[in-house]
A protein has these predicted regions:
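Short, intrinsically disordered, charge-balanced linker/junction segments flanking boundaries
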Residues: 1, 209-210
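Histidine-rich, glycine-flanked metal-binding segment
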Residues: 1-8
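Phosphate-coordination loops involved in phosphoryl transfer and adenosine-cofactor binding
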Residues: 4, 72, 205
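Alpha-helical scaffold segments that flank or form the walls of functional sites
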Residues: 7, 26-78, 83-101, 122-137
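Metallo-beta-lactamase
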Residues: 10-16
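Hydrophobic "anchor" residues on beta-strands that sit immediately upstream
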Residues: 11, 73, 169
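Short active-site segment of divalent metal-dependent hydrolases/proteases
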Residues: 18-20, 176
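Metal-coordinating catalytic core of metallo-dependent amide/deamination hydrolases
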Residues: 79, 84-209
Length: 210
């Protein structure tokens, strides 16, 4: 008896940002961004640079509880917490397992905070992917996360290709803003998707966000 309701398959959220869950509806006094990059650097990147592991985990609880309440049983998350990279995906996983929701996690690799943090974010992906591949519960998976073409150098692209475990795809933003395209044409002489194709990023297991 559905009691007047409709029974249907559960929803899948194919691109989520758990780290931003506590910023929904956020209004910052005196903050008037003038464009895409202003919004990224003035709000989202500022938030992710200050997240602790505990805050990341609490953000995951908030997102997953909201997902379950709205019929979402699988979440693909594209995470960033450059203030505390290592262990952040495991913190999110703990919340997912506690609530019984299926999730596929990745960390958004980016050179925007320097090459040391970029490499650390690569290793966070690699280590979590290996951990997820060894898990036989069918409730957790990993992907190679990347922020966007305009914050990823050829050096980092090469490192990702070299270290990505077999059998998984990439999860990356593509043309979220026109700046991404303009920068790619200026810096690399090609469009974003062409650059990703040349670096073997594309494929049946890769997700392109936006």
């Amino acid at each position: 008896d559905a009691k007047g309701g409709v029974i249907m398959p559960a929803f899948i959220n194919a691109h989520e940002h758990i780290y931003s869950s506590f910023a929904r509806g956020l209004s910052i006094k005196g903050y008037n961004p003038q464009g895409f990059l202003d919004i990224l650097d003035g709000q989202w990147w500022t938030i992710d640079r200050h997240l602790t592991l505990e805050q990341t985990k609490l953000s995951a609880y908030a997102t997953y509880i909201d997902s379950i309440k709205n019929g979402v049983t699988t979440v693909f998350d594209h995470h960033a917490s450059f203030g505390h990279i290592t262990g952040s995906l495991n913190a999110i996983e703990e919340a997912a397992k506690d609530l019984g929701i299926r999730t596929c996690l990745c960390y958004e690799i980016s050179d925007r905070d320097g090459m040391e943090k970029s490499r650390e974010s690569v290793m966070e992906n690699v280590n979590f992917i290996k951990h997820a591949l060894a898990d036989d519960s069918d409730m957790i998976a990993g992907m190679m996360g990347m922020h966007a073409s305009f914050t990823i150098s050829d050096e980092t692209m090469e490192l990702c290709n070299e270290l990505k475990p077999e059998g998984v795809g990439y999860h990356i933003h593509v043309a979220e803003g026109i700046y991404d395209l303009h920068q790619c044409l200026k810096e690399h002489g090609k469009r974003i998707v062409d650059r990703l194709y040349d670096w073997n990023i594309l494929g049946p297991k890769t997700l392109l966000g936006h």
